[in-house]
Amino acid sequence: MTPGSIQRTLVCLSLGLGLVPGAVTAVERSIYGLNEYIELFDLNLQVAAKLDTGAKTASLSARDIERFKRDGDDWVRFYLAIDEAHEHPIEKPLARISKIKRRAGDVAANDSKTYTARPVIELDVCMGSALRRIEVNLTDRSAFQYPLLVGSEALKAFDALVDPGAKFVAGKPGCTIAANSAE
């Protein structure tokens, strides 16, 4: 099934629901592929990302992550762990600390800690023509193919449906900062 045929099917289904008394019509959703190009507005960088409905939060590949205080507020300093990224430190306000469940294979038999604590920042990200502010946790993803993983919370912000058989459906990001809204 092509992305266009999926969209037509969804439209037909939503129109058909309107014929059934008391039925709720479908919300207009954007269809994205398993992988999409995403622009990280705050960092002036475009990356290929994996869209993962099984992950709750988004994760960005970062290294040398350290928390610090600035004017009494919590901040985080890090370097992007992405080949084409800049080699200067990035500093952002810390939104919160996220507890991420560790995979069973990553936990030693004598280790009782089943989660890792990761700093979370907010970033303006563009996918297709949609610009949203999402939470992103920082971790070293250099062992993975994609430096950015977009989880279900961010996908909800984009009103996204993910077609796992498609890739780069939205094309190159095309947002302006003036278009930012979570409407």
Role assignments for model-derived ranges:
Residues 1-5:
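N-terminal secretory signal peptides that target proteins for export/translocation
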Residues 25-183:
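Pepsin/retropepsin-fold aspartyl endopeptidases
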